[in-house]
Swiss-Prot record:
Described function: Catalyzes the specific phosphorylation of 1,6-anhydro-N-acetylmuramic acid (anhMurNAc) with the simultaneous cleavage of the 1,6-anhydro ring, generating MurNAc-6-P. Is required for the utilization of anhMurNAc either imported from the medium or derived from its own cell wall murein, and thus plays a role in cell wall recycling.
Protein name (record): Anhydro-N-acetylmuramic acid kinase
Keyword set includes ATP-binding: yes
EC number of this enzyme: 2.7.1.170
Keyword entries, A-Z: ATP-binding, Carbohydrate metabolism, Kinase, Nucleotide-binding, Transferase
Source lineage: Bacteria, Pseudomonadati, Pseudomonadota, Betaproteobacteria, Burkholderiales
Binding site for ATP: 22-29
Family recorded in the similarity comment: Belongs to the anhydro-N-acetylmuramic acid kinase family.
Gene: anmK
Amino acid sequence: MTRSGGPRVSTPGRLFIGLMSGTSLDGADGVLVRLAAGQAPQVLATAGLPMPDALRAELLALNRSGADELHRAALAAQALARVYADAVQALLQQARQPATAVTAIGVHGQTVRHRPELGYTLQLNAPALLAELTGIDVVADFRSRDVAAGGQGAPLVPPFHAAMFAAPHERAVLNLGGIANLTLLVPGQPPRGFDTGPANVLLDTWCRRHTGQPYDDNGRWAATGQVQAALLEHLLADEPWLALPPPKSTGRDLFDAAWLDQRLQSYDGPAPAPQDVQATLQRFTARTVADALEAAAPATRDVLVCGGGARNQGLKAELAMCLQRPVQATDAAGVPAQWVEAMAFAWLAQAFLDRTPAGVPQVTGARGPRVLGALYPA
């Protein structure tokens, strides 16, 4: 690829790339979009690359303390940057665009620690290497500036959701990644948003353990089981984080295989079959979302869903039942559900270059709006 060169003038119709690998660790998503003031983003290319098995295993391991983890984290960050660079190459080839046409890449990295209450969040990333490999300016490290201002550093996508999905009525946007998070859109008010609890992170973990498959396709395995009401209430009652008021955020630091195993071990009912646990976890995700929405925005009229979980028809059916509102993918509003989060990081890169604050205090609890990100020139 050709280097992108020196400073650019802020002009309408700039091209940005957004890259995202989420808590579920199923792969890296990339999107090439044209962003122009007053216009809907124009998607020029998309790419979804699977996460190499060895890298996925190492990233999972790095969510917990272990031997020589600083060295291992540095190597994993470099390997991840090479996956991202492959995604960039695929996008440019698909769109038949040179690297010089792209203003910047916005890349999230891979969260391995998120402890805003201790003043830090850590995303494994090698943005300098990504800039070197692609020849394109890279904007990264979007969360730490908000955390430095006393915020949660998450979720980051509500201002993008507000720009894309605002309606004349109260609406919610639900991102179903590894963790579920809600954006609440009320006409005439800044967006609010917060994490509601686990989504794919527990569903995928349990499915992989018992079926060998990376995820429960359309909730088919869950459909063979029965929701265990007593186990569901045990899961809901046994986690203090769920009762915390917003702003709040979470991740694999809390909701992981160890969390689930501990709850199953402390459950005093009959041992449930694996498929019954899967059905119960699916209902658990839907209930935590519904309970959070009812507490924070009971006048919400409809819910748009994005993220990997938007493809799970079984989970969407559970959500519709628990939410008692219309639930549909963001595709219905013109933005493909699979690419919303990657698009958000392209949008956040643009906001950084324009020095537009993208941190929303009503979402994160920060002391004020902040410009998010750091620049790594090509």
